[in-house]
């Protein structure tokens, strides 16, 4: 039985992860974490998540919670994730990281800390999106420079980072497939007299509104035709299910950095 701890336990994602853990064989919740000033501290994690009493109090003591777990599932913010990973590394546990919005320097810090543990880092845990990553790479390689690559992502109005981590990963995959460096060809804003589109540009546009869980579309524009690859998430359960699948998979794995492509056998 894999013993899991969940950060952000009183948040939208944390609640769904706790619910999915309860419905999944081979894994159990042993700890729930929130920040030191959260209103839910001391409350039962199951009751806060809406799944009934579990006998596990939400705590801000990351060290104590991680110590009794096998794997930490972390959907928080970059600075919090880095702090949590340091504790996971200290106790030689495993981690599943779904946080997004990392800067280049922050991601390097994450990789450095996580290098001596078994750790999954993925901007999107859904099965559909991870299959989409593979399809986008294949389409980009096949269509090559004859097709313009653009993408649009939409999320709920409360999302703090933009573009989404998933959109950035899709753009990176497409750029790699056609031999380009996204930092050189990525275009994240167009306004005014921008001139004609550069042949090698990869555009990423962001929309925010309502309660959209997550929509991503990659467009390949050719002459006289257009290919669209779209994924729409209608429930956070798709991410929670992937995270729990990842927690089951990573337990007992050799130290190293993995992603959901490894978990799903898509590599």
Regions found by a protein language model. Give the residues of each.
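Extreme N-terminal starter segment of soluble prokaryotic enzymes
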Residues: 1-4
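C-terminal substrate-binding/catalytic lobe of Rossmann-fold NAD(P)-dependent oxidoreductases
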Residues: 7, 12-63, 144-267
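Short, ordered loop/turn segments at secondary-structure junctions
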Residues: 35, 100-102, 124-126, 154-156
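Rossmann-like NAD(P)-binding element
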Residues: 63-83, 89, 93-94
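Short glycine-/small-residue-rich Rossmann-like dinucleotide-binding loops
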Residues: 70, 76-77, 100, 206-208
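Residue-level detector of anion-binding/catalytic polar loops
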Residues: 71, 94, 118, 148, ...
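Rossmann-fold NAD(P)-binding glycine/threonine-rich loop
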Residues: 82-91, 98-121, 130-139
